[in-house]
């Protein structure tokens, strides 16, 4: 019997451990809040550390860079360690990271703390799909992933506004101390409910290349890069577009972004249902819809009310993306889900950097409308690749 068949049989026999799924979701909430906090606290952080805002902004860059590297190396490095302890270690790293940032006397110490957070983020996401496969039956994987990614949506919605508000009230250092609390609770909860999960495959760097060589994997990773690049190019320059084209006020921009966050949460919540109906169609239609939205923004972006609607629909559509591609990973390579997860994390982190950087170059040449046009092209290309070059297996049905 092949290793793939063994893995699939093991998955099907798993009894759902929903408390463990929710404990991981709480840990994810803490990780994502910590990741996005600097964006809303950049000015006071820079002033306190006596550096420029540009230098303080490297706190975000450092996290993304180390997350990319960690996603690729975490499986080989921890190949002999019980996954229960590895996952809890990521919660410990988030706690240490937040406290290091909170008490950092210099930018160097702050960046070191952010590097630890990058290890936790890259490591967790590379193992998230493989862990989910071992916590719930195959038919329930989309639902479990939707729960975990719902925590991402909630964290994304609350991190920036709550961080900005609390930073003004209690100071940015105290905000990072509070940020450690969800991970403390998550760590204790995980200690209580996470089962022992011995490594099921011997991960190595060679395994990454073997997984990538499987039919449809390169197409899937390329589609992922295009979708995330298109999204982050669009989202990074959304505010300048709203302020210059639609002449939206600061309050109006905040409301539109809130609408995005709420719709994103709803999209994530219903992702499991839609993906279980037709995985390939969902993976293909989402970037197609997003490309149409980008084009409509370019054509009718001067109407603020319409922009609010289009951005909300974009948020809903993008809510399906992380769950969708994690589900694709779980159904395509269940026997090497950790190594494949590392490739997915690296692809996403690369896409985030490329989307923001490439969008910046286009923005300087042709403004936000040019960025949105380029974003639409990337997303449309992703749809074509999903249909033509991605191997998709149907999601198991929950009888």
What is each PLM-predicted segment?
Residues 107-109, 138-192, 241:
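Helix-loop-helix hairpin linking two adjacent transmembrane segments in secondary transporters
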Residues 70-82, 267-279, 363:
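Helix-to-loop junctions at the C-terminal end of transmembrane segments
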Residues 50, 82, 103-109, 247, ...:
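Helix-breaking motifs and short loop linkers at transmembrane-helix boundaries and internal kinks
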Residues 113-151:
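Cytoplasmic helix-loop-helix junction between adjacent transmembrane helices
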Residues 69-105:
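Conserved MFS/SLC helix-loop-helix module at the cytosolic interface between two early adjacent transmembrane helices
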Residues 332-368, 374-375:
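A late C-terminal transmembrane helix in Major Facilitator Superfamily
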Residues 97, 108-116, 305-313:
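Paired small-residue
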Residues 281-325:
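C-terminal transmembrane helical hairpin of 12-TM major facilitator-type secondary transporters
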């Amino acid at each position: 019997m092949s290793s793939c068949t063994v893995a699939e049989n093991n998955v099907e026999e798993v009894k759902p451990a929903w408390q463990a799924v929710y404990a991981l979701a709480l840990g994810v909430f803490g990780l994502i809040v910590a990741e996005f906090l600097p964006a809303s606290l950049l000015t006071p952080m820079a002033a306190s550390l006596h550096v420029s805002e540009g230098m303080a902004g490297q706190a975000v860059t450092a996290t993304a860079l180390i997350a990319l590297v960690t996603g690729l190396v975490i499986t080989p490095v921890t190949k002999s360690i019980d996954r229960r302890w590895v996952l809890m270690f990521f919660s410990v790293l988030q706690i240490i990271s937040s406290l290091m940032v909170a008490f950092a006397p210099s930018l160097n110490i702050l960046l070191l703390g952010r590097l630890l957070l990058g290890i936790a983020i890259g490591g967790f996401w590379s193992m998230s799909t493989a862990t989910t496969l071992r916590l719930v039956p195959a038919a329930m994987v989309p639902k479990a992933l939707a729960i975990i990614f719902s925590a991402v949506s909630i964290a994304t919605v609350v991190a920036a506004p709550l961080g900005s508000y609390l930073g003004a009230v209690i100071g940015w250092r105290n905000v990072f101390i509070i940020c450690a609390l969800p991970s403390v609770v998550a760590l204790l909860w995980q200690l209580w409910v996470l089962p022992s999960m011995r490594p099921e495959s011997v991960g190595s760097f060679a395994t990454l290349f073997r997984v990538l060589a499987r039919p449809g994997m390169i197409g899937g990773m390329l589609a992922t890069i295009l979708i995330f690049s298109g999204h982050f190019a669009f989202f990074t320059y959304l505010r300048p577009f709203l302020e210059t084209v639609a002449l939206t006020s600061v309050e109006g921009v905040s409301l539109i972004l809130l609408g995005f966050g709420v719709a994103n949460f709803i999209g994530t919540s219903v992702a499991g249902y839609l993906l279980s109906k037709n995985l390939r169609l969902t993976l293909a239609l989402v970037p197609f819809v997003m490309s149409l939205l980008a084009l409509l923004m370019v054509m009718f972006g001067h109407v603020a009310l319409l922009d609010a609607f289009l951005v909300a629909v974009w948020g809903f559509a993008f809510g399906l993306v992380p769950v969708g591609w994690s589900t694709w990973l779980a159904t395509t390579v269940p026997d090497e889900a950790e190594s494949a997860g590392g490739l997915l994390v690296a692809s996403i982190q690369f896409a985030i950097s490329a989307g923001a950087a490439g969008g910046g170059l286009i923005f300087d040449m042709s403004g936000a409308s040019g960025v949105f046009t380029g974003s639409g092209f990337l997303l449309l290309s992703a749809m074509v690749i999903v249909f033509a070059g991605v191997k998709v297996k149907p999601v198991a049905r929950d009888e």
